[in-house]
């Protein structure tokens, strides 16, 4: 990651633990992602770019992602192929918290015994799938 604030190299499996419980090896400038380390250099925090390392790693290892990744600055977005723009709402191409975080309200869904420290779409999708699969089985 290198947004003009330094270079940061990272990979899964190091000593730093993120908010979702994933361990990372990082080398370089944490300021590239406005990241900080807490608790004796063991907990990685990236509030400006939630779940930054996992989201970037997922994109970098996607076979169809290409070789360059960009994240739009707050207030800007990359218009999709159909020409749709959503400035001020959910947009295309930003890892920033203003485009990544949203309220989550659940009703009638069984929560996991050990919920993640930071929720992601993949967690919600799993809950909803389990909920409706169970309801279909009960019919």
Could you say what each language-model-derived stretch is?
Residues 1-114, 119-125:
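Active-site neighborhoods of enzymes that stabilize oxyanions during catalysis
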Residues 1, 134-139:
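Polar, surface-exposed loop/tail segments
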